[in-house]
């Protein structure tokens, strides 16, 4: 798992607003890091890393919520988390179904065909959701 960007220059005398800006900027930088994995497709590791970074950003937003003006951003981050969660779930399901199809007994082609059909349906959903993420 990627480590969060260290936030330097904060101390006990740091003004809360300044600390919030620095911490939120660091967490946002972490969200931007895996974007390269979304350029030509959506790779599973980039989805995972972005989900982790968004979870950290959202936690920071919740900490600084009393400063005001962050609820809208927090809702947007939550929507991104949900969208990435849907894609991640489909990646995991498709990988599991691939493994199950490979293990299906060769003398039971109906089972293998059923698993493959289910996997293909998941992959069709995945394509649409990945396109939305790249948009």
Regions found by a protein language model. Name each.
Residues 1-135:
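Cationic, histidine-enriched alpha-helical/coil surfaces that engage anionic ligands
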């Amino acid at each position: 798992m990627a480590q969060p960007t260290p936030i330097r220059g904060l101390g006990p005398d740091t003004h809360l607003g300044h600390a919030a800006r620095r911490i939120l900027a660091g967490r946002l930088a972490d969200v931007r890091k895996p974007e390269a994995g979304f350029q030509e497709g959506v790779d599973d590791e980039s989805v995972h890393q972005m989900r982790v970074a968004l979870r950290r950003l959202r936690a920071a937003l919740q900490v600084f919520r009393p400063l005001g003006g962050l609820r809208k951003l927090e809702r947007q981050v939550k929507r991104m988390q949900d969208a990435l969660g849907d894609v991640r779930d489909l990646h995991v399901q498709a990988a599991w179904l691939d493994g199950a199809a490979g293990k299906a007994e060769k003398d039971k082609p109906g089972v293998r065909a059923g698993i493959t059909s289910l996997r293909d349906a998941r992959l069709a959903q995945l394509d649409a959701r990945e396109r939305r993420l790249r948009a």
